[in-house]
Amino acid sequence: MNSWTKKWRRLFFCVAAVMMTVVLAGCGAGKSAGGDAAKGGATELKLAYHLPVDHHLSKSMEKFAKRVEEKSGGKLTVKTYPAGQLYTDKSMNDAIMSGGLDMGLNSTAMWTTVIPALNVLDVPFLLPNYDSVAKAIDGGLGKTLEAEFEKKGVKNLIWADYGYVQFANNKRPLTKPEDFVGLQLRGYGQIPAETIKALGASPVTMGSAEVYMAIQRGTIDGQTSGTTAMFARKIYEVAKYLTITNHAFCEFSLAMNKAKWDSLSPEQQKALSEAAKEIRDEIRKETKAEDEKTTEALKQAGMEVFTVPAADVAQWQAATMSVRENFIKDNGELGQKVVDECLKASK
């Protein structure tokens, strides 16, 4: 064997040895990374919601993402997708249940096709004030509904308050149930539509973005929604009368795919839970303040505001009792249970 052959052979073995070392090191590194992930290594979660970026709930989700990263020491991060960038409110829930989306903030009204018992929050005059809402959601009602979520492979991290539902119209002051007779009002779902009908008006189905023009053109006389939504959509420009009934409550759910939750380390789960609960408490205070602030803003913008006196609530309850009865009939024992939990919290 000549000297050139020997040199090439030595070079070949040196290169082969180096390549083998790199391969083994790579395998070792991959194994280590996998082990770290299983023990609570860096994980990114995707969080979607349809609300615009300037909405107070959207801002709360940004705070939530930041706190998760802080509390986990960077081992868990949350990437947010606001304003329907990733999923709309209609497609989001299926994505969460299938695992296509890790987390989503969505109205409980959008979950009612999956969990009909969530409609209880729209059953009129069950939860008269913010204290009763908090007591119900943090207590028996919340636990019962969270168990229903888990049956669908979903973990409800927190309930995020959106606010009370009121009535606005451009025809006349609504100071008693009889004043609703003959009006055409837009409702946002099954129970709100039943409530409108029980009060003697005709429910109309349409998207929230269509309401302003519909009132302006006379297609409808008014609508039911929260004052924050009324102010944001400038309903005060087309509707003169606002009736504060607090007859229903809009709640959002920060829901997570249960399998994804189970895949996290205990430390990551703790960071997620702690951040979520902190944000829940802040949202609760902000929502109550926003309700009061936007009600005053609507008044300043020219709307006549009538608040149903506590002494008159009983007659409004009586007028809409059929809605409660139908809800219980449609949902059986579970329906009766969640109604009872609301009534217990309101005492």
Segments (PLM) and residue ranges:
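N-terminal secretory/targeting leader peptides
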Residues: 2, 28-132, 141, 149-347
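Bacterial N-terminal signal peptides that target proteins for export
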Residues: 2-15
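C-terminal motif of bacterial Sec signal peptides marking the signal peptidase cleavage site
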Residues: 22-26
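Residue-level detector of intrinsically disordered terminal segments
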Residues: 18-19
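Short beta-strand-centered segments that line the small-molecule binding cleft or hinge
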Residues: 135
